[in-house]
Amino acid sequence: MTDPRKFDLHDGKMGAAITVRVTPRSKRNKIAEILKDGTINIHLTSRTDEAQTNQDLIGYLAEVLQVSPKEIEIIAGTSGKDKLITILTLDSNMVQQRIMKNLS
């Protein structure tokens, strides 16, 4: 069955790239929704500064995607809520499967 919520992932030279919108100060860490433009809205319990939120995001994505945090990098948006992230060891199909499996 095809999922109607479409989001675009991109294969890079290595791995895949995703766009993420982070909502801090949430009750629990979760993938909340896929926005119309393909951005993955992630809620985090982080209540501290941006650097800690970025670390928490990488840790949460590593758990969801079943990879080491060292394989995830924030390429753009380190100081904002919208971020471009690469996952070095997974292709876009595998990232999409694991994101959809964890969508709340």
Task: Locate the predicted segments by residue.
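Short acidic capping loops at alpha-helix termini that bridge into adjacent secondary structure
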Residues: 69-71
